[in-house]
Amino acid sequence: MPWSSPRPHIMITKRDGSTVAFNRDKIVKSILAAFNAAGEAQISEVDTMAESVEACCSSGAVSEIQDCVERSLMDYGYTNVAREYIIYRHKRDEARSLRERPDSTMLSDYIFYNKYSRLDVASGHRETWDQTVDRVRDMHIRKYAPSSLALAEGKAPRSLAITNLIMESFEAVRSRRVLPSMRSMQFGGKAIEVNNCRMYNCCYGPIDHPDRMSEALYLLLSGCGVGYSVQWDHVGCLPEVSALVPAAPVVHHTIEDTIEGWASALRVGVLVPRSPAGSGPRSSYEYVEFNYSLIRPAGSVLRTSGGIAPGHLALKKMLESVRAAFCSAEGRQLRPIEVHDIMCSIADCVVSGGIRRSAMICLFSSSDSEMVYAKAHGNYEGHPSRAMANNSAVLVRGEVSRSFFDRIIALASESYGEPGFVFVSSKDEGTNPCGEIGFSGLRPESWGFCNLTEVNCAAVPSGSAGRSSFLEACRYASVIGTLQAGYTRFPFLSPRSGEQALAAPLLGVSLTGIADNPQVLQHLRDGAAVVLETNARVAKLIGLAPALQTTCVKPSGTASLLLGCAAGSHPYHARRYIRRVRVDADAACLAYAEANPSAVSDGCILFPCMVPDDATIRADLNGIDQLELVQALVRDWIIPGTRAGATSQHNVSATISVTSGNGTYHSVVDHVWNGLRFFKALAFAPMDIENNYASPPLETVSTPAQEALFNSLVLTYKAPRYLSIDNDSSPMNHAACDSERCSVVHVPK
């Protein structure tokens, strides 16, 4: 398997002067590639040949290793293969001499200033990275160590301990060894202090009460991705829809221009109409007429959370759509598909309002045929708002049959990758839109929140220092995540959500950049133990219960771009590729486009990307390799990071790239079925997915035209003047979860 650990006793000096541990698997891959190029069948001696190459090495230079490969091929009598390997080396050297190397900060700086940097009031310009880190750090100090100003007099030992923990941990954020919740980077400060929902990337809750719908709007407006369930057992708890009183007077409701005001309009005016006397829900209700006069015009600046006001039209459209759905169901309960469409209308309001791109996942009962075919057989075209949520059937391990699983997979292959699937141990388990967090045992009428931090594996050094560095990063990530778990003030939500967060706090310490540094796979169990121990210690210090689930692997789309590493457990797309990022109205985007007009094409900014020579790319792994990595991460990171007594566990959220033909896809499906206990939610994508797009989000550089475009983007690049930006439009122009990989994409046949 290409993910085996490097051999630390031999250090290899790369062409850029850096050193990495010798990894025999890379030798095996190069030998097999030479056999393929020569059109010869692969042989059993390949491992023996790799051993001889390892024994041949003395200086540890890359060129010497390649010489040893040539000699080994010749010694074993494979002269044709050796010739192909020599040609391959020559072409690689020639191509390398012609390549331009992009500025390593080009994309990461753009991501930071576009999504996380806020307006620094003192200077009147956007924050630097250090200022953003300080903003989030100081928020935690205000919450947990308010007496820290008196520490010099020795009056507050508890505050001193907490302050030291916070200061030390955020130095690791400053050096980008770890990341806190990416929502805290965007909203840290007043925006989170008045609404703790903004701390968390995602949440999950069953739709078992009408209030869950208005709360979902509130959560999406707060920046949370929303996972929800319309399983029979949950939707069956909803009351029958009341009938409109024929001659009742019209009730007027003026909508406040806050996220609470928007969500209250949905709750009071549509979902749970009440009598004028406030006596509670009735069997019939009055018509509510909305007044939108207090809502700021589109384009106004939002001061607390940042961003631009969307105006009232999207809200009005949503309220009318949801009202129509309720009217069509008078005298009966809503069906799961109707609840799902209501939720999609709510999310569409958030998107159409220009506030942010919503992220949602809908879990449904596997026996619900309307939900199974929600995006199939033309149903998607008739209900375009269903694009707002990914749909996944809940498959209970031990109950679902292989034939039904195959049916779901077959339907997904014909319907743009949906429905997806989520394997659970009981129907009460749920997940967030990206699928890395497991929820179970939620209190009635409550939401569970994803509390995420991240370890940058690419920043872990090679060699003997790697283990201690990785464990230290795990400790810092656990400290920060435990501090985040104490933010449990959720205005507008049912009090039970706060009670749930206090009684059963969750933590999700994730890993990213594994493809940059597979050496960390040796230390996962030790790292998980550090996460558990640190969480228990810090939780006791701040008065929280220890988390039962502490480790996960999230997709890490945006966070990995900020760090300049591979995303989560995924390999890089290719050695060199062009990334297209959609143009938005944020000032950072406009600054980049102004400095680099030739990099803007068809509504996207084009970024040239080049990955380290020794990093793993998609072509290095087949589908089974990727699944085996997921299994290893579950076995050595997820399970060891789960305490006894937990009724669920977190997950490795991954998109598996699959090569079409030769039964490869079917072998991948077989592997998933045969290892159910290791898998919860996966997405599949064809290896050649970029061929499905005229302008793919990620485009491999493989033709002369692409080579010319890549080099042009590198040579003409000019650093934008981000610090001169004097407005705060940034944080509202982001996805409602931190992924890019949440979407289940087309499954190859």
Predicted regions and their residues:
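Extended catalytic cores of very large enzyme megasubunits
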Residues: M1-K749
